[in-house]
Structures are given as structure tokens and as C-alpha cells.
């Protein structure tokens, strides 16, 4: 593999000195880019786009042609694992992802197997290999998965949910069935992330989108404990470099210290978190990634720049911060606002860094 020309992102995740704060954006390959919409139309549907390695590679690279981003994230979907388990993923207009065969009983859980990434998810592995070749060392490539709890939410509910009645009903009434499902998923995610690393991912991220829907006790027992198992099982060195692991629980600001105790390298934080306080909470245990409200990108470029400045200042001097949004970029944002953000972060963060940290 080509030598990495820009390792700012990886260094920041490991709290090593950098010349400026690195930035990438959740869902940076997405509908806000006209070139993405063009490829998406050519693919015909979202699932075809995800499962065609050449197209997934192309849309992964698109934002890097426009913006001076410090990392690429492979274009895929968090629901690839349940799809590979045979649940029949489809996308319904206006409703988002749905499953033809939800999992709601003990027997249905027991029937689930752990997918083989090189056969059942070969399209993801091929997209990673292809993208690494195309990147040619320009920036690191991020692999990812949904967390066991978040995957279980979709699998039990059969799609998105506002109240999580089905999965919480299962969790409270049949906790042993819920734990069995989460154990299978933790194993599947670990195998999947390790395969992504072998295929070329240089950092990996766990998206726990729905962890924030749980109480403190239930978050610990049904979400965090399984993410901790994955952190423990993920390969942490490849190609002579450390492979950082990022955990992101949306709405997880109350649990940062506990999350830092999993042994991960970085925590994603959303915009409800005070970055200065978060840094004090986690100390030197982990790096932090975030945390601009995605809606700031609807404001003027000057306001975007001001917000970037405030977030950089809130984190303060030294390495250990990767700038990102607090969640995915919205489809209706204008690309020039992203350009303004990336330029602002790179320019305004320089005074906060020295190589003698």
C-alpha cells in the first residue's frame, strides 16, 4: 500500500502532535453533492449503490475532490450486517430502511448466524480495497459499523422507530433473548471490522445512533458493554501502524467517562455536549471528535467560520481533537458551506498546535 501523505487524522486520534486540527464530516459522501446524486441516479437505488464496489468507491472519493478533508469514510450503510443475516433490507420512500423479516422471538434470534465478510459482505471489502488503491495514500480510510444495540433496534422494530416500543418491550420482558441477540451482533461486528481493517481501513468507527434512547443502567448493560467487547476484539495494529477505534453514541454526553473506559481511542460527541467540559471529563484517556450542529451549515459562511472558531477554542490547545459535525450532514446543505468550514478549521486551528506538545 502507498505511504500515507497526510496522517493528521490518525495522529489526532492517538493524541499525537499535529500541525492543525483535522476535519472530516459524517455522511460527507452524500445527497448534498450534485455529483453524488448523479451516481445515485445511475445506480437506480441506494442498495445497488452500496453493493456495487466501483460506485461505492466513486462516491467515497467525491468529497475529497471538492474539499481538503483529512480522511475518507467508506460509502456503505450500517445495516449491511442484518442484511447479510437474511433479514431482507429494503428502502421505502419517506420511511427509510425497512426489513422484510424482523427478529422478535427467541427462535428467530437463535436462527441468526454471523456473516462471513469475505463472502456475505464481499462488496464492502472490495470497495475498501478499491478505495485504498485510488486514494494512493492521500488520506486515511475509515471503516465503520453500527453498534450491536443500534443494529438490534432496526432488526427488532423492522425499521426506524420513534418510541422503540418493540425492542424495549423485548429488553424488559425477555432480557436473556435481548442479550443473546446482542452477543451474536457483537461477534458479527468484531469479525466485520477486522475484515475491513484487513481490506484497508486505517481507523474504524462504531455508530451507536440509538444508544441515547436508553436509561443509564440500560445503556451500560445493553449497549456499552457490547461495544466494549468489540473494542477488545478489534485488531489494533495493521501495516505497521496503530488502528484507532472511535465510539459514537448520539445523545451519549452523560456517559463519556464510562465510554472512555472501554479502551477505545476516541469518542464522537454531538452538539449537545460542551467540548471543554468533555475534554476535562475524559482527561488524557481519549481523543474527541465533533461537535458542530449540522444546522450551522444553513447559516452564512461567516457564521460557519465563527462557529468553527468557537468549537476549536472550546477544545483548546494541543492534539486530540478531530473536527466533525455532531451527526450526519443534511442533504439540503450547500457544498460551498462545507468548503468554508473545512478552510476555517484548517486556518483557525494552527495557533492551537505546536509540534513540541
UniProtKB/Swiss-Prot annotation:
It is found in: Cytoplasm. Disulfide bonds: none annotated. GO terms for molecular function: uroporphyrinogen decarboxylase activity. Pathway: Porphyrin-containing compound metabolism; protoporphyrin-IX biosynthesis; coproporphyrinogen-III from 5-aminolevulinate: step 4/4. Pfam families: URO-D (PF01208). Homodimer. PANTHER family: METHYLTETRAHYDROFOLATE:HOMOCYSTEINE METHYLTRANSFERASE RELATED (PTHR21091), UROPORPHYRINOGEN DECARBOXYLASE (PTHR21091:SF169). This is Uroporphyrinogen decarboxylase. It comes from Nitrosococcus oceani (strain ATCC 19707 / BCRC 17464 / JCM 30415 / NCIMB 11848 / C-107).
